[in-house]
């Protein structure tokens, strides 16, 4: 590829609509750039992006990691270049190829606690795969862990999602401060989701980050979720699609 891919990472507190907005970004990119290669990465162990995009996942990134580790532990010594080649092949083999985009899920490690190993692997995968795509959308893990561990180090656009709550805005303020030190992003902005009344907007305080869009409560999206339908079933004028479009336009992606 001749130009740098645009890698859009979406982060924020859990439960604020991060995954839904990530899915809306993917849909918009497929509509505006139908001839581009687009990759959606579900980097959240809560594994919701597949449902939001209508994708059935059979194998995850963590499945690949564990399989390769097991082959090293159980078999003869193998050269690092051989393992890297196998990992690259397996990753592409594991991708779900839809008509308009490709999809890869991080998965959910079976053991409780730290996701350090799979996050370290994810960082390498993002670097490995991004050169093969025009646009990459990453639905990040809730909170700050993946930012803190430099998993998102090379993203070009960082989009922080919050609701109007003070807890939500505090989380994205913290993510932004850490990202300023650890992420080599080109543009960063925030989306405030589920704004039930415009009168709330002056009371929402976000430090040092441009607000890209305020998205009101979206009854059509809530109904879509309840019915288990994908973001592609939402009307074009639904609040979440309009808000996502506004945000990507301000970031000069659309």
What label would you give each PLM region?
Residues 7, 38-40, 101-103, 211-214:
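Conserved beta-strand scaffold positions in the cores of enzyme catalytic domains, especially
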Residues 55-59, 178-179, 205-208, 230-232:
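Short, hinge-like loop/turn segments at secondary-structure boundaries
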Residues 9-78, 135:
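Walker A/P-loop NTP-binding active-site region of P-loop NTPases
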Residues 1-5:
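Phosphate-binding P-loop
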Residues 34, 117-223:
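Conserved catalytic-core segment of NTP-binding enzymes
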Residues 243-254:
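C-terminal alpha-helix
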Residues 227-238:
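C-terminal boundary of histidine-terminating zinc-finger modules
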Residues 45-127, 226:
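P-loop/Walker-type NTP enzyme "switch/lid" segment
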């Amino acid at each position: 590829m001749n130009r740098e891919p645009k890698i859009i990472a979406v982060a924020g507190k859990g439960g604020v609509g991060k995954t839904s907005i990530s899915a809306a970004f993917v849909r918009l990119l497929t509509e505006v750039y139908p001839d581009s290669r687009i990759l959606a990465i579900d980097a959240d162990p809560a594994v919701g992006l597949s449902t939001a995009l209508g994708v059935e996942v059979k194998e995850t990134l963590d499945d690949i990691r564990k399989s390769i580790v097991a082959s090293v532990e159980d078999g003869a010594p193998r050269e690092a270049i051989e393992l890297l080649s196998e990992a690259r092949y397996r990753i592409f083999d594991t991708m779900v190829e839809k008509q308009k985009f490709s999809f890869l899920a991080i998965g959910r490690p079976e053991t409780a606690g730290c996701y350090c190993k799979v996050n370290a692997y994810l960082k390498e995968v993002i670097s490995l795969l991004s050169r093969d795509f025009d646009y990459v959308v990453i639905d990040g893990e809730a909170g700050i862990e993946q930012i803190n561990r430099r998993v998102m180090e090379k993203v070009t656009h960082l989009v922080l999602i919050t609701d109007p709550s003070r807890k939500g805005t505090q989380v994205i303020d913290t993510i932004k401060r850490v990202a300023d030190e650890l992420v080599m992003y080109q543009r960063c902005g925030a989306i405030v989701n589920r704004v039930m009344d415009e009168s709330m907007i002056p009371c929402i305080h976000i430090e040092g980050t441009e607000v890209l869009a305020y998205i009101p409560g979206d009854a059509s999206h809530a109904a879509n979720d309840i019915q288990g339908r994908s973001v592609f079933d939402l009307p074009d004028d639904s609040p979440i699609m309009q808000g996502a479009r506004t945000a990507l336009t301000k970031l000069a992606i659309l």
